[in-house]
Design a protein with these regions (language model features):
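A conserved beta-strand element that flanks and buttresses the S-adenosyl-L-methionine
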Residues: 111
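Conserved beta-strand signature within the Rossmann-like core of class I S-adenosyl-L-methionine
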Residues: 138-145
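Class I SAM-dependent methyltransferase SAM/SAH-binding core
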Residues: 50-99
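Short, glycine-/aromatic-enriched active-site segment of Class I SAM-dependent methyltransferases
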Residues: 146-163
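A short glycine-rich, Lys/Arg-flanked "PGG" loop and its adjoining helix->strand segment in the class I
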Residues: 125-137
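Short alpha-helix
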Residues: 164-180
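Core SAM-dependent methyltransferase catalytic element
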Residues: 192-207
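Conserved class I S-adenosyl-L-methionine
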Residues: 1-45, 149
Length: 207
């Protein structure tokens, strides 16, 4: 059974998936494309890429699916349905990725675009360890972490109750290294959303 906090996230994105897609159209200075391009430049065509928290078929997932064998995972059934329609060439799985079990060395890259801020703190450490195991030696992790010291918050966002948590940047960096990754890039980036400034820590690391 999913953690009650991650189930809150599933229910939230079931309820406000289309609202969220429209909301993110208002981003100014969004770094996703630049970081994704960096990841793509390090992969061969046809590489196996796992997209954690893929949502309803984001532009990032769509671009990855143009060159790679993409498996998207999302906890929201409605978002997964939307993704399957939007990007039929990719494979999508509805699951709580904090509980996901996959064979070792299954992917050349794992990407997670501004999703780990929904992961309860105590679940992030084992998740990073499993991600390392899912990657082939030399595989890549691209992720954006929440960049604030947030033990856990549940409340309304975009019209639905959801959950957020996170560590400060220095802790995120340490946890990535402790999961036996070598960090290639590590930057805190601020961009504008319709709600105001957003601050996330972007990390590109090699297994």
């Amino acid at each position: 059974m999913p953690d009650p906090r991650t189930q809150i996230v599933a229910d939230a994105y079931d309820a406000m998936g289309e609202t969220f897609a429209a909301w993110r159209e208002g981003f100014v200075g969004d770094p996703r494309r630049e970081w994704e391009d960096d990841l793509v430049s390090r992969l061969e065509d046809g590489a196996r890429v796992l997209d954690l928290g893929c949502g309803g078929g984001s532009p990032e997932t769509r671009r990855l699916a143009q060159r790679f064998a993409v498996t998207g995972v999302d906890i929201s059934p409605r978002q997964v349905e939307r993704a399957r329609v939007a990007i039929p060439e990719a494979e999508f799985v509805c699951a709580d990725f904090t509980e996901l079990e996959l064979p070792r060395s299954s992917f050349e890259a794992v990407a997670s675009f501004v999703v780990f801020n929904h992961v309860p703190r105590e679940l992030l450490v084992p998740l990073l360890g499993r991600i390392h195991g899912w990657l082939v030696p030399g595989g890549w992790l691209l992720s954006a972490f929440g960049a604030s010291d947030n033990p856990g918050w549940t409340g309304e966002w975009l019209g639905a109750e959801t959950f957020f948590a996170g560590f400060p940047p220095e802790v995120n960096s340490r946890l990535v290294r402790e999961a036996e990754f070598t960090i290639e890039r590590d930057e805190v980036v601020v961009y504008e959303s319709p709600d105001g400034p957003e601050r996330f820590q972007w990390v590109l690391a090699q297994a």
